UniProtKB/Swiss-Prot annotation:
It comes from Bos taurus (Bovine). GO terms for biological process: early endosome to late endosome transport; negative regulation of phosphatidylinositol 3-kinase/protein kinase B signal transduction; regulation of protein catabolic process. This is WD repeat-containing protein 91. Residues 282-299 have a biased composition (Polar residues). Residues 265-336 are annotated as: Disordered.
Amino acid sequence: MAEAVERTDEMVREYLLFRGFTHTLRQLDAEIKADKEKGFRVDKIVDQLQQLMQVYDLAALRDYWNYLERRLFSRLEDVYRPTINKLKTSLFRFYLVYTIQTNRSDKAQEFFAKQASELQNQAEWKDWFVLPFLPSPDTNPTFATYFSRQWADTFIVSLHNFLSVLFQCMPVPVILNFDAECQRTNQVQEENEVLRQKLFALQAEIHRLKKEEQQPEEEEALVQHKLPPYVSNMDRLGDSELAMVCSQRNASLSQSPRVGFLSSLLPQSKKSPSRLSPAQGPPQTQSSAKKESFGSQTTKGREPAGAPKDGKSLFGGLAPGESSWSQHRQRRLQDHGKERKELLSMTLQCAEKKPEAGGPEAEPCPEPHVEALETLTRVPTAGPEGGGVRPEQPFIVLGQEEYGEHHSSIMHCRVDCSGRRVASLDVDGVIKVWSFNPIMQTKASSISKSPLLSLEWATKRDRLLLLGSGVGTVRLYDTEAKKNLCEININDDMPRILSLACSPSGASFVCSAAASSLTAHVDVLAPDIGSRGTNQVPGRLLLWDTKTMKQQLQFSLDPEPIAINCTAFNHNGNLLVTGAADGVIRLFDMQQHECAMSWKAHCGEVYSVEFSYDENTVYSIGEDGKFIQWNIHKSGLKVSEYGLPADATGPFVLSGYSGYKQVQVPRGRLFAFDSEGNYMLTCSATGGVIYKLGGDDKVLESCVSLGGHRAPVVTVDWSTAMDCGTCLTASMDGKIKLTTLLAHKV
């Protein structure tokens, strides 16, 4: 509700300004500034009560509570009156305990002097009048509970929850219902998008099934063209059976050697015996094994080649006494028909692999075979080397699009919370905000006069962008109005804003400011740009209020102030993890605003850090090229460690003609997870690479190589707001690839 009230205030203010009602606007601003209800923000109301207690202003505290009773609590039913009275009693007791704890017994005596007439007839206050005169009230059995930290925290939480529920249940005017309508509209749009993606997937499946129905006829025609006429009507005949058939042939064919089906098939497909040795086992075992491997390639209920009709024509000349043997033969033909097609499928697969081996007898597979095989699998090439397809591949690539409106290397590329818009920033200070559904379209564009180093979407108001510069400022940019709302100066001594992270609650954001880089004082053409130690400069980590745009506090960075390269919140904003230039990961408790733990994580700088899906661990990538998982319940406990290629961790190098070389140190996110945290997207020299996490191996298993880039990818993002995940990969040539993936549900 607080968010809806805030948006409504802004809309009313904008309307009054549009109409020219400046006097009314000034009056509105004055009343909003003096608003005792704090825009229905529960945290602000509770803070106001605590502030009045801290200055011992009993009269103001009592007046403020009476105001809340008159404006808010009076709307409740009588059944909630006892709860309100208990909260009021606890509030006054909280005030009394605070006066005793701060050695202000005079304020406690003043409280009873002013409240005696009201409290002396209440049984719950009978024992409290002696409180100011006790030497050690915190040890008294009657009052010990109220002096504990647990009781104070419980009271604050109870008051907070009571006000939250009250605001949610309050009847609101019609103008405030717009927020609910917007949410319903967004939900309907999301459902429509999900249904559209499902329809797209079903259409692809129908197309695949139609291709599968056409494939057997193509395979049959191909085999009959290659094999002798009598073999095309038989499946794996034994020598004794073949002898009977030979007696029915013409004179020219009767001179042929008596061989089985496999011995006739092998020379035609140029298969080695070792490749087909499993096919010589029992028919039932072979058939069941192939069903598991190629279950998606065969269609049940189809009539196999070599049907009983063919068997009749072949054995039509047999004596009547042999009719039972003919029926047995027809059944065997039916049993072997399906196995033959499965064997042919394996033949196609092996024929595709043989040219890769580079053998002297390898032949390119005919075009109809390749097309049929690709239609059957319907999965993209797996692995960074572009190896063969695998039926267990976890994702299906539905499509890949390119956003090419940047003309220099990308630094940041982030999807907003709704998964509908993307904000991208390049090294020239060009910001682009664009959508990709249903079509790719630029929504806003801006060029910064000062260099920009960091970018972050605001969580609650996803139309706003936070932009950190290289001159010590943070800018709040409205992507819909296409203008800067405000610009704040962080620190002149720490001009580089390296990282921004907005709390999931939307009430605050953290800002990492650092002194000028060491590379600013050396030749920019030196070959060691981006090497170790270039960012070993002092830094600060600051907490700012999103609404007021004022600094709330500065975090302590032990053992000494250092530049913080990356920051990330957990899902509720209670924890903040940071990676610094000294290789240390620090975990901050955002409720106590202090560092809960820290440990040396990497040799060199920490480039990127994120919470895991269950938030029991954090992952980090460092300058040492390692991807490490850490347990946050035990400081410095390493869960797993993997080595990554140099093109996944940076610094990133783009080489050109005449010895030209462009080097870029990592700025944006280097890895991102899918919706369940089982797979990870990373950078590479030619595109994004998806790895499977949680395996027992000591190396990461590469699942999908997205490809599509001609320059090194420097930052990635993975949006899972829809059923179909969207992977973003941005490279040093300014190209951004948007790949749509469909998870392969098992």
